[in-house]
């Protein structure tokens, strides 16, 4: 069973996305902050991390940068799931962070599942 980590400070959104992907047969690991994400990555290696950008303490961008700096996690797949518009971050920044997709909220459930399956090769 493939694992997806959802990193978002909005508990309701995490629960919604968790329900969507559990129904699709994935194991879902919730993390409610960048710090919690990094702590959980010490113990578990998800097949994909869905990362919010706007979080208190450590942004999704900062968290992804730390993931890329760690030899144990640098090759993990990361996609942003955020209210931030692509024009606000820029494609070059995404390339630098090796972010595989940029999904904006609000999202269509079927589109989200399709895009995640594409990243995971399912």
Located regions from the model:
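Charged docking surfaces used in two-component/phosphorelay signaling
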Residues: 15-23
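Active-site beta3 strand of CheY-like receiver
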Residues: 44-50
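Helix N-cap/capping motif at the beta->alpha junctions
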Residues: 30-39, 60
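Short acidic/polar segment at the start of the alpha1 helix of CheY-like receiver
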Residues: 10-14, 87
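Alpha4 helix (beta4-alpha4-beta5 surface) of REC/receiver domains from two-component response regulators
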Residues: 18, 62, 84-103, 110, ...
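Receiver (REC) domain active-site loop signature in two-component systems and cognate sites
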Residues: 55
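Active-site residues of response regulator receiver
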Residues: 52, 82
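Short amphipathic alpha-helix used as the core "switch/output" element in two-component signaling
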Residues: 39, 61-74
């Amino acid at each position: 069973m493939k694992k997806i980590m959802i990193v978002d400070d909005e508990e309701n959104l995490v629960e919604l996305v968790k329900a969507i992907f559990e129904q699709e047969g994935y194991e879902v690991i919730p993390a409610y902050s960048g710090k919690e994400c990094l702590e959980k990555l010490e113990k578990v290696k998800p097949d994909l991390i869905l990362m919010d950008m706007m979080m208190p303490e450590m942004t999704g961008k900062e968290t992804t940068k730390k993931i890329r700096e760690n030899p144990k996690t640098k090759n993990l797949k990361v996609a942003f799931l955020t209210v931030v518009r692509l024009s606000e971050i820029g494609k070059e920044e995404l390339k630098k962070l090796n972010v595989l997709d940029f999904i904006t909220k609000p999202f269509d459930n079927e589109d989200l599942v399709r895009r995640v399956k594409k990243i995971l090769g399912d």
